[in-house]
Amino acid sequence: MQNIIENARRLYLGLLQKKLPSYQRDTLEKISSSNAKIMGLYGARGVGKTTLMLQWLKQQNYTPSQTLYISCDHAIFKETNLFSLVEYFVQHGGKLIVIDEIHEATDFEQSLKSIYDFLEIKILFSGSSAISLSNPDFSRRFAMFSLPQLSFREYLEIKLGYSFQKHLLQDVLEKGIDLSFEINQRLENEKILPLFNEYLAHGGYPYYFEDPISFPQKLNDTINLVLQMELSHLFSIQPDKIDLLKKLLVVICRSKPLELSIEKLTTNVELSKPTLYKFLDYLQKGELLRQIPHELKKYKSIRKADKLYLFHPNLLSVLCVKGDIGTLRETFFASQLAAANHLVEFTQQGDFVIDEEIVFEIGGKSKDFSQLKTLEKPAYLAIDDIEVGTEKKIPLWLFGFLY
């Protein structure tokens, strides 16, 4: 076990010698203010979990001998029992350990529970989004934190080097004209619409800034790793089914959400209905797919199929040769509202209903209120290709400032 600890220290030293990004996401502050014994960080592959954990680790007031970083996807940890490793570390003075890619460890759920019950040590671990979603016991025992893809606001902060305030949805609705004016004025020599189009293509994943040219290939590699490593491992998916998962994503990417049906998908991907439903659930847990329920689905007597979107607009640029612009806009809107912890459902009049109260129609400059005029609920248009809106016609890009 001592050899494994020494190897872990060498790997950690190598990581620390690399320059960490100076940009710090809001989730880092949330984790830093937590007093929980064991904390978990979950999110899609590629959103910056490792970077955030290393930033947090450098802020802690422990000596090097009292801290340890391990990544469970590294070969030296593959056959190591996680509880035994942490127990040995505690017995030799360990106070804090950061565990990356914990879902790669054998029987990690039981190991974490045993560590929580029997060992005195502070832990921050990371893993696939599917960990938190598939194991409700985690959120009861541990402090769990979500790290979403970069918002449009965060993308601008990294690209331009200065900060923008995030805004509540109510402020966007009530003060949209003033907010959009203020943001446009701060851009100096930049224009908001070209920046927004950049974000839709590549702005959700921080590694874009490391090597913009190779971003499409790296995002495609990320998708393949989620399918081949995370989902196949967590849900025991047979290797011959992985290509069907990828095919399912491509079919969804190339289709308009309202034109998709379970029958069409079972035919196109050659899956039975029960298997298809399982695969859709796996893809959502891996943050590759977003299933949006109808607002009436909560009434069991009313059966409505979910609308299916890719999880983030960047995925369309890799999985579709040319995606539908309407789908791209709706994907962005749903991704920003959901990441800001709003309930997103679809409705017959309009595109989405948010928090069961507010209806939104998404579209281009020519979109009007004709589809919304008979609604009793408050209704707004989220419009692409405009820099500044009107009272109930809000620039689509402004919904990227919610988190």
Describe these PLM feature segments.
Residues V98, K122-S128, S146:
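Structural recognition of the conserved hydrophobic beta-strand(s) that form the central parallel beta-sheet
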Residues I38-L41:
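Hydrophobic anchor at the beta1->P-loop junction of P-loop NTPases
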Residues V90-F108:
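Conserved P-loop NTPase "ATPase switch" module shared by AAA+ and STAND
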Residues L16-S34:
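Pre-Walker A adenine-sensing motif
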Residues Q2-G14, S128, S134-I242, L249:
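Interdomain motor-coupling "hinge/lid" segment immediately C-terminal to the ATP-binding subdomain
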